[in-house]
A protein has these predicted regions:
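Hydrophobic, aromatic-enriched interface-forming segments
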Residues: 170-251
Length: 358
């Protein structure tokens, strides 16, 4: 189940409800914060349920909306935001739990293009806001940009959040790699990398709470990034050790003539940076890296013109799960986590029962 970042539904049963389901990475968490900030400016009495998960499969999305709809019904005054991740499956949407409310999907993943739903009548009332050239966080800011013409308070909020959204976008869609050496670009690159470090060290809940609670600060940008820079130093020490480990355990796999490196044992919090170091190490000469982990998922990273979103999508389909993502960063599930847990419990209980009779 997804993590609950904020739940104020008990504050009022009559007030408009805002439900946000977002991706559990830095981009998704900043996105959720931006939506909440602007929605509260529009009506401070609104109630919120904000949930996040790194598992963006259709199976997980359907389960999360089962939970959301079990305890609430939604009407025309309510809003449901699905950020940086896919909408529920067509089969789930056909049950029409969300048919009478406002559903907004803001995303930028190649495998979540709105065109794939054009022939599905159950998706006709979903508003899609999609652009693969921007991160989810910056798309959220652009979504609310028309409001700045209505009031100075919206303009101030937009200006306060833009540096964070810009740096988040720079990290998430990898444009930090193309920045130059001017003072402005070096600062932007440092901010982009520190956002990833902060989210990975703090975890989703603490990261979201920090960027939210600091919103009332007059020096918002300086305060959050000064803290993120400190966390970035600690993160980089860990990265150096993990890179040495990755080089020792990586194994080769030939995929359609590409040299693919397979690594087991690197936590998801460190995979993007480790992959970047491996892919651009000329001695290693890998074109694709695949990370396998204990949660039953595979994360792909690539360079040049290799589209791993297609690889992840096809692999997910073959093993019975959904998959996808960006051209150079994608993932899918290949094992059921609940089944893995069940198997471990069975082995544990069986072995413990044997110990009792020894």
């Amino acid at each position: 189940m997804a993590d609950i970042l904020c739940d104020t539904r008990l504050k009022s049963e009559e007030a408009p409800k805002v439900i946000i389901l977002t991706h559990g990475d830095a981009d998704g968490l900043v996105s959720a914060m931006i939506v909440k900030a602007f929605e509260e400016l529009q009506n401070k009495n609104k109630t919120f349920l904000i949930m996040s998960s790194m598992d963006v499969t259709l199976e997980q999305t359907d389960k999360t909306f089962d939970y959301i709809c079990k305890y609430a019904s939604f009407g025309s005054k309510d809003r449901i935001y699905i950020l940086d991740r896919p909408i529920p499956s067509v089969e789930w949407l056909k049950m029409k739990y969300l048919a009478y409310t406002n559903v907004i999907n803001i995303d930028h993943h190649l495998t979540n293009k709105p065109e794939q739903y054009k022939d599905e009548c159950c998706c006709d009332d979903i508003y899609f806001y999609w652009n693969d050239k921007l991160s989810a966080a910056y798309l959220k800011l652009e979504w609310f940009k028309p409001l700045i013409e209505k009031s100075e308070v919206y303009k101030k909020m937009y200006e306060k959040l833009e540096p964070l959204a810009e740096a988040t976008s720079c990290w998430d869609i990898f444009t930090w790699k193309n920045l130059g050496n001017s003072q402005k670009e070096l600062l932007l690159k440092r901010r982009a990398l520190s956002i990833n470090s902060a989210e990975k060290i703090l975890g989703a809940g603490a990261f979201y709470n920090f960027i939210t609670k600091k919103l009332n600060s007059e020096n918002y940008t300086e305060e959050i990034f000064n803290y993120f820079f400190l966390l970035d130093e600690a993160y980089n020490l860990k990265i150096d050790n993990l890179f040495d480990f990755a080089k020792r355990v990586i194994s080769d796999f030939d995929y359609k003539g590409y040299k693919l490196g397979v690594i087991y044992g690197i936590d998801g919090d460190y995979q993007s940076i480790i992959a970047d170091k491996i892919l651009f190490d000329k001695k290693l000469d890998y074109e694709v890296v695949a990370f396998l982990n204990v949660y039953g998922t595979v994360s792909f990273r690539s360079k040049n013109d290799i589209d791993v979103s297609d690889i992840a999508k096809k692999l997910g389909m073959i093993v019975g799960y959904s998959g996808g993502g960006h051209k150079h960063a994608s993932g899918c599930r290949i094992c059921d986590r609940d089944e893995m847990k069940k198997k471990m419990m069975e082995i544990f209980e069986h072995s413990m029962n044997k110990i009792k009779i020894l």
